[in-house]
Design a protein with these regions (language model features):
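Acidic two-metal-ion nuclease catalytic site recognized across multiple nuclease folds
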Residues: 227
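Short beta-strand-centered segments at strand-helix junctions
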Residues: 176-193
Length: 227
């Protein structure tokens, strides 16, 4: 486990500065981080405000962290899951041809989210930056509820990857579980839906985010123009 405390905005530091600088460092090398579009930084392997990271497992928990950036507003931090809930599912794809379907975990990277359904429960569709619905993933080939290095090495893809309500979804919701989709509570998704129909989504592992956070210089003054 890794000390996760550097991730969280310390007293006296403006959240826009702290989380915005982390996002900027994590965006580097992919595309310049836009300041005029809503963005989500999804951090896998650390629960919101947790002191330590944790092993990523296929369980029905919002034990990852999301940070929504909207121009003109402070960052909105929310609990989410960037992993599946189940170890197997008949609805999943058989990634290794052994006759047993394998749930998927989206690989870290940069994606586009498009709001496909707004009411009654918001749903976003994942796409690559090139516009493909074929999303890079790892699959739990041995069905032990986690991705090991052997599974990580296999370059696989998944389709129909969404961001939707999860295990605490209201009765009647079409989505309550996940075999590859990202999930969050209805309240969080309603906030995200107000940000706009198109959102850029940067997914990183917790250890990578923590290293970026350690490079952030605390700044007690808010910026002149909040972005």
């Amino acid at each position: 486990m890794t000390d996760a405390r550097p991730l969280w905005c310390p007293p006296g530091t403006h959240p826009v500065n702290h989380y915005g600088m982390i996002l900027g460092k994590l965006w580097g090398g992919l595309l310049p981080p836009p300041t005029d579009k809503p963005r989500i930084l999804a951090i896998r392997g650390v629960a919101l405000f947790a002191e330590e990271t944790h092993e990523v497992l296929s369980v029905p928990k919002y034990d990852d962290t999301g940070v929504l950036f909207v121009p003109g507003a402070e960052p909105f931090l929310f609990p989410m899951a960037t992993h599946p809930y189940q170890k197997d599912s008949r609805a999943a794809t058989d990634g290794n041809g052994d006759g047993v379907p394998d749930v998927a975990t989206v690989r870290t990277g940069l994606y586009r989210l498009t709001l496909a359904i707004e009411k009654p429960y918001p749903v976003w569709v994942f796409a690559t930056m090139a516009g493909s619905a074929s999303i890079p993933c790892s699959r739990d080939l041995n069905h032990d509820g986690k991705i090991d290095w052997r599974e990580q090495e296999k370059q696989l893809t998944a389709t129909a990857i969404l961001l939707h309500v999860g295990h605490d979804a209201p009765a009647g919701s079409e989505h309550r579980s996940s075999i590859g989709c990202a999930t969050a509570s209805l309240r969080s998704l309603e906030v995200i839906a107000r940000a706009g129909r198109q959102i850029l989504y940067r997914l990183v592992d917790a250890d990578v985010a923590i290293e970026a956070a350690k490079l952030v210089t605390p700044d007690t003054l808010p910026p002149e123009n909040v972005t």
